[in-house]
Design a protein with these regions (language model features):
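Conserved strand-turn element in the central/C-terminal portion of the radical SAM core barrel
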Residues: 116, 140, 144-148, 168-192, ...
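Aromatic/hydrophobic pocket-lining residues that form the small-molecule binding cavity
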Residues: 59, 92, 122, 161, ...
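Catalytic cores of alpha/beta
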Residues: 122-126, 184-202
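Conserved SAM/AdoMet-binding glycine-rich loop
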Residues: 67-170
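Conserved, mostly hydrophobic/aromatic
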Residues: 35, 43, 59, 79, ...
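Canonical Radical SAM [4Fe-4S] cluster-binding loop centered on the CxxxCxxC motif
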Residues: 15-61
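Structural preference for beta-strand elements that scaffold enzyme active sites
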Residues: 28, 76-78, 108-110, 136-138, ...
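Auxiliary Fe-S-binding modules of radical SAM enzymes
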Residues: 1-23, 201-203, 207-307
Length: 307
């Protein structure tokens, strides 16, 4: 959807700067700006954006601007920025209602969310949001290892991650969890893999989406690598970590490597595709030792920034 052509108001359409790859065809609607937490040591995406809730009038103006161009073709909407479900439930219900009125063919509305926010939302509020048309929540798990969650300043415990996931599923949401390969570095990759699998098994989310940790300038872990206090995981370690993660999964989730940061595509429906997924990783680990071109390709991934 080429909504970049929107130029209907002097102030301009306010686009969310980031969205999941799976929302590449969605209309983007900015409800909040920035990240209300903004302390994770691996992330610098919102460091320069103060958190604020956008006025409802501005949001409704943006919906009207988009409706004028894309009323009938809009099938999905992504709500940004990083945790818009923390606004008042009645306000988000109003926004969802207006979206459905403006775009009669909407099939899906999704949003980023924090586990802590989901934990704090009363179950009846989550059900109201679901009934109003919010269908999927994208949530960063990153890791299920308690020590790592603390060291990266995620702001949630493994138990809170589990509580949030179960609560969201009980309210009827599709639940998409993000795992950050390599976040344990060379020192803690096994604990990361096992702990993450344990949390995922207790939630059984609809989607597990993996990304590979890439140090971002301006983040705490980038500085730690430069200072020599964090040893970045090698290509081989990250492949072995993903292998251990998948081996320990006992879920019915769709597993997706739908991000440019990942070294190789490992995708499938669990549990039926587990053996094929592990075979892909076995082949990559074998090739890594013998194929200079593959090693160079992996190294180019390491130079990516802000993905």
């Amino acid at each position: 959807m080429a909504i970049g052509r929107l130029r209907l108001k002097p102030r301009g359409y306010d686009f969310p700067p980031y969205r999941p790859p799976s929302e590449s065809s969605s209309l983007l609607l900015r409800v909040t700006r920035g990240c209300p937490w903004n302390r994770c040591t691996f992330c610098s995406l919102y460091k320069s954006i103060p958190f604020e809730r956008r006025p409802l009038e501005e949001i409704f103006e943006d919906i009207e601007a988009a409706r004028a161009l894309y009323r009938d073709e809009t099938r999905s909407v992504f709500i940004g920025d990083s945790n818009s479900i923390l606004i008042k439930t009645e306000d988000l219900v109003r926004i969802l209602t207006v979206l459905h009125q403006a775009f009669p063919n909407i099939e899906r509305i999704t949003s980023y969310a924090r586990a802590k926010t989901i934990c704090k939302k009363p179950p009846e509020d989550l059900r109201r949001l679901r009934e109003a048309g919010l269908t999927r929540l994208h949530v960063g798990l990153e890791t299920g290892d308690a020590e790592l969650l603390g060291s990266i300043h995620k702001g949630s415990t493994p138990e809170e991650m589990v509580t949030a996931g179960r609560k969201a599923k009980e309210a009827g949401f599709e639940y998409s969890l993000y795992v950050l390969l390599g976040i344990g570095g060379e020192e803690r990759w096994e604990q990361h893999a096992r702990g993450t699998a344990a949390v995922l098994n207790r939630i059984d989310p609809h989607f597990i989406r993996v990304r590979t940790f890439i140090p971002q300038p301006g983040s705490g872990l980038y500085d730690a690598i430069k200072a020599g206090t964090f040893k970045k995981a090698s290509h081989e370690t990250i492949l072995k970590e993903q292998q251990m993660l998948i081996e320990n999964l006992d879920v019915t989730s769709t597993y997706l490597s739908d991000h440019l940061s990942n070294y190789i595509p490992v995708n499938g429906k669990l549990p039926e595709d587990k053996h094929c997924m592990l075979d892909v990783l076995d082949e990559a680990l074998t090739a890594l030792h013998d194929d200079e071109t593959l090693r160079e390709r992996f190294s180019r991934k390491d130079s990516l920034r802000n993905l």
